[in-house]
Amino acid sequence: MKNKLPPFIEIYRALIATPSISATEEALDQSNADLITLLADWFKDLGFNVEVQPVPGTRNKFNMLASIGQGAGGLLLAGHTDTVPFDDGRWTRDPFTLTEHDGKLYGLGTADMKGFFAFILDALRDVDVTKLKKPLYILATADEETSMAGARYFAETTALRPDCAIIGEPTSLQPVRAHKGHISNAIRIQGQSGHSSDPARGVNAIELMHDAIGHILQLRDNLKERYHYEAFTVPYPTLNLGHIHGGDASNRICACCELHMDIRPLPGMTLNELNGLLNDALAPVSERWPGRLTVDELHPPIPGYECPPNHQLVEVVEKLLGAKTEVVNYCTEAPFIQTLCPTLVLGPGSINQAHQPDEYLETRFIKPTRELIIQVIHHFCWH
């Protein structure tokens, strides 16, 4: 029942007060079970059917799917329940206490992106869900900030095929229809240690890595020349060498060297294609030094994503907002949801606030976000 639902600001406050940090470091990682329970109870109060899905390979993490209405198609509104960790020394406010000041709502997850669920719940007060002609789905996922395991698993296991989806990441209510992917690898070279006074008795891993880096930089140049997507501010795939470490003393032949790198592919480039290009680039080193070079994923890869620019979802949202869709360089869960249906990324708050101390969402987004959610539900679920 709608009268059981707390006021908008109290929903927001409860979401922010419920920690749901995702981190690769086990000591910082938290379950999102309490937050999922909160959301599940509220959607049940509104008459939704609710399914809670354990996500394999995680530390007690869950997805939630709330659904109402019958038939095929419909609309999926999606978002993630987790946040990044916070740096206690850089926050001037309690990250788990929602505070309002000077037209801003402060708290961890206000913009990225637990607050989106408060907007959905509040908007549903003004939607007669008994009159829906197509189903409405609300998806809350786990671990977006680390492995994206929740969205991956949901996309792999669900039979749902909505007409379209909107992911409420903070885009300042500017619709996003495409973004790059992300691949992060560790290049490891195993040499053979020895005393530096006789280099011939060892294999210097740093020297081998120097050779490997030369080939990787050639790949970077080839990617820039071969692939283009002019709508992006950086209109080609980027390759970055982000971290390197090797050796332990100046008088020892380096036995091991490790390089961390990432590639941000354009939409349409497959992960298999990129892995092949990287392996081909490193093949001369591997052939010269068999068994000494390995390539391992640092994180599960994320492909690029694109919603067809002429899809009805794009046309409807552009008309409602009076704004053209954009493309961005950061990543979201859209590549996985896009395997189910055409998907846009669109939500309140600024991406510039994501992962920042004293994260906030400007209150000027409250009214237009609420109105937009009502409008897209009416368009895709009532017609």
From Swiss-Prot:
Family matches, as CDD domains: M20_ArgE (cd03894)
Keywords per UniProt: Amino-acid biosynthesis, Arginine biosynthesis, Cobalt, Cytoplasm, Hydrolase, Metal-binding, Zinc
Protein EC: 3.5.1.16
Catalytic residues (positions): D82, E144
GO molecular function: acetylornithine deacetylase activity; zinc ion binding
Residues given in the record as Zn(2+) 1 binding sites: H80, D112, E169
Binding site for Zn(2+) 2: D112, E145, H355
Enzyme class: hydrolase
Reported cofactor(s): Zn(2+); Co(2+); glutathione
Gene3D superfamilies: 3.30.70.360, Zn peptidases
GO biological process: L-arginine biosynthetic process
Superkingdom of origin: Bacteria
Any Gene Ontology CC annotation: cytoplasm
Chief place of localization: cytoplasm
Pathway per the UniProt entry: Amino-acid biosynthesis; L-arginine biosynthesis; L-ornithine from N(2)-acetyl-L-ornithine (linear): step 1/1
Catalytic activity, reaction form: N(2)-acetyl-L-ornithine + H2O = L-ornithine + acetate
Protein localization: Cytoplasm
UniProt cofactor note: Binds 2 Zn(2+) or Co(2+) ions per subunit.
Protein's job: Catalyzes the hydrolysis of the amide bond of N(2)-acetylated L-amino acids. Cleaves the acetyl group from N-acetyl-L-ornithine to form L-ornithine, an intermediate in L-arginine biosynthesis pathway, and a branchpoint in the synthesis of polyamines.
Assembly description: Homodimer.
Family of the protein in this entry: Belongs to the peptidase M20A family. ArgE subfamily.
Record protein name field: Acetylornithine deacetylase
Taxonomic source organism: Escherichia coli O9:H4 (strain HS)
Lineage, broadest ranks: Bacteria, Pseudomonadati, Pseudomonadota, Gammaproteobacteria, Enterobacterales
